[in-house]
Amino acid sequence: PLADAKDVDAAMRAAHAAFPAWRALPVAERAALLRKAGDLMQQRVYDIAAALTLEVGKNRMEALGEAQETVDFFHHYADDFEQHAGFDHPLPNDPIDGVVSRNRSVMRPYGAWVVIAPFNFPFALAGGPVAAALVTGNTVVFKSATDTPWSGRLLAEVLRDAGFSKGTFN
């Protein structure tokens, strides 16, 4: 069945309700969950690729490439955020002589993100923004393309099985 306005409202409420606890979780814990999701995707890469082949009509190698790319997104964002301590660091001084900067580069969570996946790369172009949003401390409301709902369901199952808390991914 298709989602209606009530379903969307419920997903947004769940994402907003989960946000305070999720954003408070240390970067290392969010990264560990993201890495676990990537590991689960890796274990399921052939099943995910089979679904992509059936849904989108990709050949086996293209589908495997998309599934593996999504695994790589999850591992990359987890590693990147851990290595850079959540991306909170001072920026260098302005290149103009005598100008001292007091700027910081901070990636911080803002709330619920909406991620809408296209039909032609439904797993990778969902997984990339979802991984970035989650590791940063945002929650996600996801909508798969109408023609490719199976890959979205597989992504949701991976995140559930990895242990993401209720309302973090909707």
Language-model segment annotations:
Residues 50-68:
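Flexible, acidic loop-helix segments that line cofactor/substrate-binding pockets
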Residues 36, 40, 69-80, 158:
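Alpha-helical scaffold segments in carbohydrate-active enzymes
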Residues 1-54, 76:
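Short, structured beta/alpha segment
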Residues 10, 29-36, 43, 47, ...:
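Generic recognition of stable, solvent-exposed alpha-helical segments in well-folded globular domains
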